[in-house]
Amino acid sequence: MSQRFGGWNRVADHLLSLTDSRVIQLNDGQAASLRELAKRLPNNGVIIADEVGMGKTRIAAAVARAVIAAGGRVAILVPPGLGYQWSDELQTAGVNAPPILRSLWQYLQAWETKDKDAPWFMESALVVSHAFTNWRLGENTVPWRWALLPEIYARWRKQANGRWPRDYCSNKMLDDVWVRQAAESIVGAIYASPENHPTRKLIEELAESTPWPGALTAGEYGRNAQLRPWLERAVGLGLGVFDLVIVDEAHKSRGQDSGLNRLLTEVVLKSVNARCLTMTATPVELDATQWTQMLGRIRVDDASKTAATTAISNYAKSVARVRQCPSDEDVRKEFKESATAFKLALNDYLLRRDKRQDPAVINFQNASGEGYHAYRREQEILIDTAQLSSEWKRAVCAAEALSFVTRQSDRTVAKRLRLTLGNGHGIASLIDQLHRDDKEDQKQIEADHVSWIATQHSSKIELTADKRLLRAEWWQNVMIQPFVKNAGSALFDHPAILAAVEEIEAICLQGEKVLVFGRFTRPLRALVQLLNAREMLRCVDANLPWPQSKVHENEEWEAILSAHRQLRRQGELDRVLLDIALAEQYQALENQRRNIREKLISHIEEGFTLKQPGKRVRALFDVFKKAVEEDSEQVQGNEDHALAVVARAMHELVQAYTENSTPSDFAQAFVDLVAAASDRDEGDADGDGQLDEAEASGLWAELKIRLHEEYNRPEGGYARLMFGETKPATRRFLQLAFNRKHGHPKVLVAQSLVGREGLNLHKACRTVVLLHPEWNPGVVEQQIGRVDRIGSLWEEKLNQVIAGKQVNGDLPRIEIRPVVFRGTYDEKNWQVLHDRWDDLRAQLHGIVISPRIAEKYPDAEEMIAEINGAAPNFSPSGSV
């Protein structure tokens, strides 16, 4: 724990060297950011607020490298699902870090043997999950989960005065070997460190504040119990002291008691001159005062925060005024002054690159003659309520009535319904509340801070004489009528789902893929089932391959019946005949896969001769090949055999039933498959950066299980669902497959909380459908950012059009398609989202008066350009 950090001026020198040498691959914008960070980090922490998809992680990884080169240590705090991406970026930047730290068990495992020479505090860089401190501790918790605090206390006391605490040696609660060895290692390292070391001060405070034998009471470690903070600090001692703390997705978990906040304030121990580097595309989402929270995360002093808060508030007010009176010279002058003050207040702490500096967006602007923001097109998928069935008209009418009635009651159920709408749940979402799943949608419910809306006559509905509440209950009963008679299939006829299906299929027919976001699992699953059922019937009718041998479940059959009716296929659908047709075409598909199996090993080997794989991939391939060679042909043909599973994966990824696949395609697909199935350092038990035969064999056994789970699915994969229960490995497989232009899935349907961060889904898709639009523009920006990234399909298509000099037509754009019930609260929902989006753009995008607002002032083009030109600019290059 006695590392010698050379200081921030040395870090600055290393950063400048990286920008000049380009040892790490950097674009011009990233290099400009590093140059600015070299100026600012010696003085204070910094917020990197680059727009989604512009490469913030590469910048942060480069800073981590520079700090380590200067003798410092780095902690990187990331959402649980981003460990894979960070592992890649750190390796690209030449930074070695162990796998993301997720749990107490994993933390203690570092001390499973006494001779293990790499405790956490010896690592130069650590990646820690935001959820690391979400420990569920209470009276019945097993001792090893809380024993580190009393162990460290006891050992420090013994070290300091030569005596163990009373009855320590005979206490059976403190007999866990890992905990004992962890405490011994931590205390020994602290005792050997200088007197002024931060760990010395903290452990002495810990020894003063830890009660004995009170520290042996499990109940004292609960969420808000007395010893919980001290246990968190004890764990932090084992991580060591950090000179740089990087916080990814820093807009998340803003609450004081959130897991991320506890990590920052209790667990991560900072050196005296430590800096915080936060990363977020949306530092402010709904309220300009959220800047204050973000400044707090980079440890800005109170006086500077107060001054910044005042400037931010004044700017927000002046934006509102100048939008109302753009022709008023005094108002414009006041706006310019407040914009300058806003810029000065945040300039030392904020860097932001946005799409104005993106080469593809500049090309679009030059070719189209439109504003840079026009490369995105927002166009509603409108549902005409006049065309609905009488049952659905009544349901929509009831939902509208609820949105009105509940505004006028203060009772609990009314508040729930009102919050449902207030959190961005328009009419489509309000109806879908009926199909919320307590378990599968728990994270979404927690994120919304909205309780379950009762839809049955039960104790959840408060029986009261309140007439307004009774009216709300009556309207609620009307709203559920479409679902009462056909509970299993009603969602397949949901107007929002049908409208989305029509739009999605039209885009897929053009050879592109579609990303769909929604909130509730059951409607999303129904959308996936219906899309798959419709595509299955089309394939059967056209005698095309479909990766399914029979109809599997009654729910799937309900979707197929609905699809049969919607597609207006002739006659009554016979399940037996359909199963026969599926079996016949599936046999043809299996024959293709068998052909792949026969040549798979030789194809991959030939591909590897043309382009050598990394040692890790080669070691895993050798284990795979050996397992195949040791088994008979009969065993190899078994569906569970590794050869069969990998062949199925290759069939999907390479589209091997075409004649164009080459050995190089197979080899690259195997490399991609290994990358998706595992973390880069997974299986490397001895930490030497390579896989020996035993390590490779152990890892391959695990990868085979993951591959089997993904590629032995019984249903077709035209559309796939990603929700809270989707495993990390499956998410990576889905990302890999979705980013390939050919093959399934064509449609990825993602629950908002799961799919809006950490996934790059841009290589074959430029359209985002919002089944349940939000009211938080920051969330929508994150969703769109999955496809609006460097190297996207949109960029590729734009370059093709410009190169082909076809710019007379409509240029390709990023398409944003919210599903909206025309003439209902949904339209209000979308309008408010636009208003909030405009506020966000005024602070971060340089668009004070958006094209939507500018339509009100057709003769004020010059004044609007003047106003937008005066907007604050936090670009590292100083201009846009």
Question: What do the PLM-derived regions correspond to, one by one?
Answer:
Residues 1-48, 54-740, 749, 754-759, ...:
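Helicase motor interdomain insertion/brace
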Residues 50-51, 772:
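Conserved acidic functional residues
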Residues 59, 762, 789:
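Short, electropositive, low-hydrophobicity segments enriched in small/polar residues
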Residues 293, 759-773, 782, 815-818:
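A short beta-strand element within the Helicase C-terminal
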Residues 746:
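C-terminal substrate/ligand-recognition segments
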Residues 776-805:
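Conserved SF2 helicase motif VI
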